[in-house]
UniProtKB/Swiss-Prot annotation:
<dbReference type="InterPro" id="IPR002226">
    <property type="entry name" value="Catalase_haem_BS"/>
</dbReference>
<dbReference type="GO" id="GO:0005777">
    <property type="term" value="C:peroxisome"/>
</dbReference>
<feature type="active site">
    <location>
        <position position="138"/>
    </location>
</feature>
<dbReference type="GO" id="GO:0009505">
    <property type="term" value="C:plant-type cell wall"/>
</dbReference>
<dbReference type="Pfam" id="PF06628">
    <property type="entry name" value="Catalase-rel"/>
</dbReference>
<dbReference type="GO" id="GO:0005829">
    <property type="term" value="C:cytosol"/>
</dbReference>
<keyword id="KW-0575">Peroxidase</keyword>
<feature type="binding site" description="axial binding residue">
    <location>
        <position position="348"/>
    </location>
    <ligand>
        <name>heme</name>
    </ligand>
</feature>
<keyword id="KW-0349">Heme</keyword>
<dbReference type="GO" id="GO:0009416">
    <property type="term" value="P:response to light stimulus"/>
</dbReference>
<keyword id="KW-0963">Cytoplasm</keyword>
<dbReference type="GO" id="GO:0042542">
    <property type="term" value="P:response to hydrogen peroxide"/>
</dbReference>
<dbReference type="InterPro" id="IPR024708">
    <property type="entry name" value="Catalase_AS"/>
</dbReference>
<dbReference type="GO" id="GO:0009970">
    <property type="term" value="P:cellular response to sulfate starvation"/>
</dbReference>
<keyword id="KW-0560">Oxidoreductase</keyword>
<comment type="similarity">
    <text>Belongs to the catalase family.</text>
</comment>
<comment type="function">
    <text>Occurs in almost all aerobically respiring organisms and serves to protect cells from the toxic effects of hydrogen peroxide.</text>
</comment>
Length: 492
C-alpha cells in the first residue's frame, strides 16, 4: 500500500474517531480512571495526546498584520504590457493566474476590532507558471518611514505600551516627531480614509517601488495600484464605534458573505512607470516610500483585474499559515533600491521562519503550483516526499540543469559605504497638497482628529510645538488651526 495515498488530508478520512496515529478510539467522552471516581491514569494516551495537541494549537502571532481575512480567486490580464515586462503571467490579455489575497489591519492583535483607525494590509499571492509572486502592500500608497532601520522602533511606538499594554498617542507622536517624513502617511491615516468600511471597498497599493524588465533587458521603475470596482467607502468615527460595537469581525464577515452570495469583489490593477533615466527630473526621490508619484505626469496604466470568487476552506491553514514575502518575485519583475523594500526582503521571510518553521514554503497555501526543484531539504516539519540520491549540484548523474537565463538589467553600484539620509527629502510638499485638495468639511474632520491626538495629557508642549511646526510647513493655515485649538503659539 502506498502510505502517501492516504495521508491525512482531511479530518473525515475515517468513519470513526482515531488517535493521530490512526488507532481507533472507542470512547472520546471519558478519561481512564481507577474506578468510577478514582484518579486519572497516565496510560490514557488518547487523553494526553488530546490535551497536548490542544496546548499547541496556537502559533506565534504575526508581529504586524495579525488580524486578517483571506479569499481566493484569479487575476486576469486585460491590457498588453509586454513592452514593459517579460513576466510570464502578464504575457497577454486573457491570461489568468490563480491568486489568494489576505486583507488585514496592521498594528492591532488577532481578534481586535476591524473598525480601528489603522492602515490595512492588501497582500496578493500570484501562483504563476514561473513561481509565486507576492505583491505585499497596504491600502495607502505611502508609508511612515523611508528606511527599514527605523521599522522595529516604529512598530514598538505604534504597539501598546509595554508596561500597560495600552496603545497611547503620546508614544506615537513622540516617536514620529523625530521623523517628519511620516506627515504624508498621517495625512492618509487621520483622513476619512483612515477607517475603511470593509475590505471590498478599499484601494490597495504595492507601496514600494519595484522594477519591470522587458525581454530586451530594459528596466522601468514601477508602482502598483489596486482600484475597487465597487468604489471606496469609509466609516466615520461615529459609525466605526457603532459597527465595531455590534460586530468586531464585520469586515471579515462582509468579505465571506459577499463571496458566498456570488457578489464577487473585484479590483483593477494599474501601474505607474518611470524611466530611471528621468528620476532626477522630480523634486522627490522615486525610491522614497513616503512619496506618491504624480498621476498627471506618470499616469495610471491599466493591466488587469483581480476577482475573488472562492472563500478559503480553512481559516488556520489559509489565513494564519499563509506567508507573504516581498522577496518572492518572478522573471520580469525585480526589486529597486528602495531602502524599505530592501529590508522587507529579509525581514518578512525571517518572520515566517520564526512563526511557521524553516519549511513554511512547503505548506500547501505557500507552495508554488508549478514544478520546482532544489537541494533544500530536511529541517523541522519537512514533509516533502523525496527519494533522490543526489542532493548536490552539479552532478553528472542528475539531469537537472540551470534554467535559461532570463532578461536582467545591468546595474552599476559605486560610491562610499555610508549611512545617510536621502538627498531629496521634501517632507512637507505632498502632505500639504493633499490637505489643500480636500473640501472644508474634510479638512475640519482631519484637524479635529489631530487636535484630539495632540491633546492627550502626556503629549508634552515640546512635542505639540514640533507637530504644529511640521504641519505649518505643509500648510500654514493648517498649522494655525492646530495652534489656535491647542493654545500653542506657532513658531513659523
Amino acid at each position: 500500500m502506498d502510505p502517501y495515498r492516504v495521508r491525512p488530508s482531511s479530518a473525515h478520512d475515517s468513519p470513526f474517531f482515531t488517535t493521530n496515529s490512526g488507532a481507533p478510539v472507542w470512547n472520546n467522552n471519558s478519561s481512564l480512571t481507577v474506578g468510577t471516581r478514582g484518579p486519572i491514569l497516565l496510560e490514557d494516551y488518547h487523553l494526553l495526546e488530546k490535551l497536548a495537541n490542544f496546548d499547541r494549537e496556537r502559533i506565534p502571532e504575526r508581529v504586524v498584520h495579525a488580524r486578517g481575512a483571506s479569499a481566493k480567486g484569479f487575476f486576469e490580464v486585460t491590457h498588453d504590457i509586454t513592452q514593459l515586462t517579460s513576466a510570464d503571467f502578464l504575457r497577454g490579455p486573457g491570461v489568468q493566474t490563480p491568486v489568494i489575497v489576505r486583507f488585514s489591519t496592521v498594528i492591532h492583535e488577532r481578534g481586535s476590532p476591524e473598525t480601528l483607525r489603522d492602515p490595512r494590509g492588501f497582500a496578493v499571492k500570484f501562483y504563476t507558471r514561473e513561481g509565486n509572486f507576492d505583491l505585499v502592500g497596504n491600502n495607502f500608497p505611502v508609508f511612515f518611514v523611508r528606511d527599514g532601520m527605523k521599522f522595529p522602533d516604529m512598530v514598538h511606538a505604534l504597539k501598546p505600551n509595554p508596561k500597560s499594554h495600552i496603545q497611547e498617542n503620546w508614544r506615537i507622536l513622540d516617536f514620529f516627531s523625530h521623523h517628519p517624513e511620516s506627515l504624508h502617511m498621517f495625512s492618509f491615516l487621520f483622513d476619512d480614509l483612515g477607517i475603511p468600511q470593509d475590505y471590498r471597498h478599499m484601494e490597495g497599493a504595492g507601496v514600494n517601488t519595484y522594477m519591470l524588465i522587458n525581454k530586451a533587458g530594459k528596466a522601468h521603475y514601477v508602482k502598483f495600484h489596486w482600484k475597487p470596482t465597487c468604489g471606496i467607502k469609509c466609516l466615520s468615527d461615529e459609525e466605526a464605534i457603532r459597527v465595531g460595537g455590534a460586530n468586531h469581525s464585520h469586515a471579515t464577515k462582509d468579505l465571506y458573505d459577499s463571496i458566498a452570495a456570488g457578489n464577487y469583489p473585484q479590483w483593477n490593477l494599474f501601474v505607474q512607470v518611470m524611466d530611471p533615466a528621468h528620476e532626477d527630473k522630480f523634486d522627490f526621490d522615486p525610491l522614497d516610500v513616503t512619496k506618491i508619484w504624480p498621476e498627471d505626469i506618470l499616469p495610471l496604466q491599466p493591466v488587469g483585474r483581480l476577482v475573488l470568487n472562492k472563500n478559503i476552506d480553512n481559516f488556520f491553514n489559509e489565513n494564519e499559515q499563509i506567508a507573504f514575502c516581498p522577496a518572492l518575485v518572478v522573471p520580469g519583475i525585480h526589486y529597486s533600491d528602495d531602502k524599505l523594500l530592501q529590508t522587507r526582503i529579509f525581514s518578512y521571510a525571517d518572520s515566517q521562519r520564526h512563526r511557521l518553521g524553516p519549511n513554511y514554503l512547503q505548506l500547501p497555501v505557500n507552495a508554488p503550483k508549478c514544478a520546482h526543484h532544489n537541494n533544500h531539504h530536511d529541517g523541522f516539519m519537512n514533509f516533502m516526499h523525496r527519494d533522490e540520491e543526489v542532493n548536490y549540484f552539479p552532478s553528472r548523474l542528475d539531469p537537472v540543469r540551470h534554467a535559461e537565463k532570463y532578461p536582467t538589467t545591468p546595474i552599476v553600484c559605486s560610491g562610499n559605504r555610508e549611512k545617510c539620509f536621502i538627498g531629496k527629502e521634501n517632507n512637507f510638499k505632498q502632505p500639504g497638497e493633499r490637505y489643500r485638495s480636500w473640501d472644508s468639511d474634510r479638512q475640519e474632520r482631519f484637524v479635529k482628529r489631530f487636535v484630539e491626538a495632540l491633546s492627550e495629557p502626556r503629549v508634552t508642549h515640546e512635542i505639540r510645538s514640533i507637530w504644529i511646526s511640521y504641519w505649518s510647513q505643509a500648510d500654514k493655515s493648517l498649522g494655525q488651526k492646530l495652534a489656535t485649538r491647542l493654545n500653542v503659539r506657532p513658531n513659523f
